[in-house]
Regions:
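Charged, amphipathic alpha-helical coiled-coil/dimerization segments
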Residues: 72-129
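Short, hydrophobic-biased segments on the C-terminal half of alpha helices
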Residues: 53, 71-72
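The alpha-helix within a helix-turn-helix
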Residues: 57
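N-terminal leader segment of winged-helix/HTH proteins
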Residues: 1-32, 39
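Terminal interaction helix/tail motif
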Residues: 7-12, 109-146
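Pre-recognition alpha-helix immediately N-terminal to the DNA-recognition helix
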Residues: 36-42, 102
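Key DNA-contact positions within bacterial/archaeal DNA-binding proteins
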Residues: 35, 65
């Protein structure tokens, strides 16, 4: 890859970031990051796994203080609830409320399902190549701690 090709790739990444930041229209006071956190909790709950702040931090690659702030905001909006782990009361588990689960279904599952239908012509091979390219871009980014 030469510098001009890299520039085109980075332009596409910028466009992709804008797509993620603007879709879909969310309720007042809800940010895309809130939906990402709700989705992580949902995915863990579906697999009957427990979810802690550290799980969200690791999955979304964001700092613990950032996750703590998002969790507080979601709890204030009654989208999640905190529970103490039975064996260790110091460990706080996160659970979706019915309202939180409804948000995931509407703003993630249904939305992604409809969007995926519109992208049915993209092959698994094309998708895997795109994922590999973006992953490689992240891994080789100068100044990024891996």
């Amino acid at each position: 890859m030469n510098a001009k090709e890299l520039e085109k790739l980075l332009d596409c990444c910028f466009i992709a970031k804008k797509i993620i930041e603007t879709l879909p229209a969310l309720p007042k006071g809800i940010k895309p990051r809130h939906i990402h956190v709700l989705h992580v909790i949902y995915k863990l709950e579906v697999h009957q796994e427990e979810c802690c702040v550290s799980d969200i931090s690791r999955t979304l690659n964001i700092t613990l203080p950032s996750v703590t702030k998002l969790v507080k905001e979601l709890e204030e909006r009654e989208l999640i609830k905190k529970l103490s782990k039975t064996q260790d009361k110091r460990t706080i588990l996160l659970k979706l409320t019915d309202k939180g689960e409804a948000y995931v279904k509407k703003y993630v599952l249904e939305f992604h399902g409809k969007w995926a239908d519109n992208l049915a012509d993209i092959s698994t091979e094309q998708l895997e190549q795109t994922i590999q390219t973006i992953t490689r871009l992240q891994e080789t980014m100068p100044g990024l701690e891996n």
